[in-house]
Every structure is written in C-alpha cells, then in structure tokens.
C-alpha cells in the first residue's frame, strides 16, 4: 500500500476575522521607526510586528496580541510595549491594545523631562558593582510600575464602560524604556505574565534575560 500525506500547510485555513465583531482588530500589524544618528553616534531603529496565530486563523478568530512603540527624537528615549492577550479571555484583543497604548502614553509623559532620571543613571554608572541606588530604583518604579498600574486601571474602566468583567480583557504585558548614553545603553523593564524580554548582542553572542516569566498552575496559564 502507498500512503500519501498532504502538505500540513494545506490543512490550515486562513479565515479572515469578521469585521463586525466587537473590538475588531486587523489580522496583521507592523511598524518601523527609523531613528537617525545623533551626537552620541548611531542609534537603534525600532521594529514591531503582530500576526494572528495559526490556530486563530484556522478558526477565524481575532488577533489577541498588540504592541505600541515610540521614540522621543528630542531626548533619545525609547518606549516599547508588547502584550499577548490571554486566549481564554473573550476581549483580550482589546485588553492588550489598552495595556500597550496606556503604558506608552504614560511613559511618554513621564519621560518628557528626564533630567533627574538621567542624572541618577549617570551616577549609577559610576558606582561600584553591588552598591545600591535607591533613588534610581524609585524613579524607575514610578515610571514603568506606574505605567502598568495605569494600564490596569484603564482595563477596569474599559470593562466597566462596556458592562463586562475585567477578566474578559486579560492580557500579559512587556514594557521597556531605554536610552543610549556615552557609556552604553540603559534599559529598564517591567512585565506581567508568561512573556519574556532579553537583550541580545550579536557580536559578543550575549543574551541577557531581563526578568523571570510568570507561571501558573498549568502550562500556558497567564
């Protein structure tokens, strides 16, 4: 007997999301921000993309993930937010969008006048390893932690306005702010959920994980 197995890719459907659903979102989104060289030398561009997963496409479900990216051309600060909406939550596609947008807007405002923060970052660079710097810890927490708290409040308000439960908008969140200084890059991050962020140096083949992914009682729980 001869058995012929079909190409697995041909078994998967790509059903467009119904545009009439609540909180419709395009099945694919991407953005590229070009950051020009300045007095500190070459900078890093920002690229982000979000594509509906294969299982969602097969069933015609909406893309749950989202992102929001920003670069302040006047002071050099980068802001990056990525959210992976929990698939078990019916409006996670909205929760992820609300979380990303709220965090970036909060950080944009917080970093409009970063003189005190940058002063502490420069001071941190001159301290010996292991020496604590409570001042910068507080400043960073107020920015990235404050952004996450604001995002949580925004999701609660969205749920209330639509007479839904907050859990219907469940989402993970990855947030980072960074800037290039004369001595190198400063990166601060905050995350909620089972995602992960890292710094990758291609030349040195170096990877630095910026935290520990959250885990639930079972695999895939957020």
Regions found by a protein language model. Give the residues of each.
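PP2C/PPM-type serine/threonine phosphatase catalytic domain
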Residues: 1-222
């Amino acid at each position: 007997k001869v058995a012929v197995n079909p190409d697995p890719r041909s078994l998967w459907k790509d059903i467009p999301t119904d545009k009439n659903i609540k909180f419709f979102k395009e099945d694919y989104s991407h953005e590229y921000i070009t950051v020009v060289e300045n007095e500190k030398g070459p900078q890093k561009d920002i690229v982000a993309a979000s594509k509906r997963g294969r299982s969602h496409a097969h069933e015609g479900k909406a893309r749950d993930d989202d992102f929001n990216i920003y670069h302040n051309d006047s002071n050099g600060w980068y802001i990056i937010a990525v959210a992976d909406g929990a698939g078990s939550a019916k409006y996670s596609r909205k929760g992820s969008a609300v979380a990303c947008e709220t965090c970036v807007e909060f950080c944009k405002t917080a970093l409009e006048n970063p003189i005190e923060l940058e002063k502490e970052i420069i001071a941190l660079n001159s301290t010996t390893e292991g020496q604590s710097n409570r001042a910068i810890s507080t400043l960073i927490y107020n920015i990235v932690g404050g952004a996450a708290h604001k995002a949580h409040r925004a999701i609660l308000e969205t749920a209330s306005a639509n007479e839904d439960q907050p859990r219907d908008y469940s989402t993970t969140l990855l947030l980072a702010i960074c800037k290039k200084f004369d001595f190198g890059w400063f990166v601060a991050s905050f995350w909620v959920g089972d995602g992960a962020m890292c710094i990758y140096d291609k030349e040195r083949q170096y990877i630095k994980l910026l935290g520990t992914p959250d885990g639930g009682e079972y695999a895939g729980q957020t």
